[in-house]
């Protein structure tokens, strides 16, 4: 089953700001993950996030694109079979997680 993918407007901007090869990698990863975006402990592809370095991302998941050094942070909305993309960005010094925390607060997620 494919879940619906929805992006925060800021995440759409993140995707557009990537270079062409990075964008292709991210879209391929999202296409794969949307088949089963649940956490790995439920048999899905998402790695659960928690409360670390002042960023409480409990209930959110990530997908790592190691070769590109990118992360995709998202939330699963089970009642709507939806995968909500919060941020797409470089792993650099946990910065992507700080951005995710800010967007979660701004959007009351």
Question: Where would I find each of the regions flagged by the language model?
Answer:
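A short, surface-exposed loop/turn module that caps and links secondary-structure elements
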Residues: 35-64
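A structure-centric signal for secondary-structure junctions around beta-strands
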Residues: 2, 27, 57, 80-82
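Non-catalytic, surface-exposed connector residues within folded enzymatic/regulatory domains
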Residues: 5, 42-43, 98
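A short beta-strand-loop micro-motif that forms or neighbors metal/cofactor-
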Residues: 23, 30-38, 80
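A broad, low-specificity signal marking well-ordered, structured residues that form hydrophobic/aromatic
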Residues: 5, 61, 83
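Arg/Lys-rich, positively charged N-terminal/basic patches that mediate binding to nucleic acids
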Residues: 1-31
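Residue-level marker for the onset of beta-strands and adjacent loop->beta junctions
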Residues: 1, 59, 70-72
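Enriched for short, Lys/Arg-rich terminal
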Residues: 13, 64-109
């Amino acid at each position: 089953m494919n879940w619906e993918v929805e992006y925060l407007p800021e995440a759409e901007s993140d995707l557009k700001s990537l270079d062409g090869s990075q964008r292709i990698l991210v879209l391929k990863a999202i296409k794969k993950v949307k088949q089963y975006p649940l956490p790995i402990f439920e048999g899905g592809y998402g790695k659960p996030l928690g409360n670390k370095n002042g960023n409480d991302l409990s209930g959110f998941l990530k997908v790592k694109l190691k070769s590109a050094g990118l992360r995709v942070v998202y939330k699963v909305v089970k009642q709507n079979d939806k995968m909500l993309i919060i941020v797409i960005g470089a792993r650099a010094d946990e910065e992507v997680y700080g951005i995710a925390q800010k967007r979660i607060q701004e959007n009351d997620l």
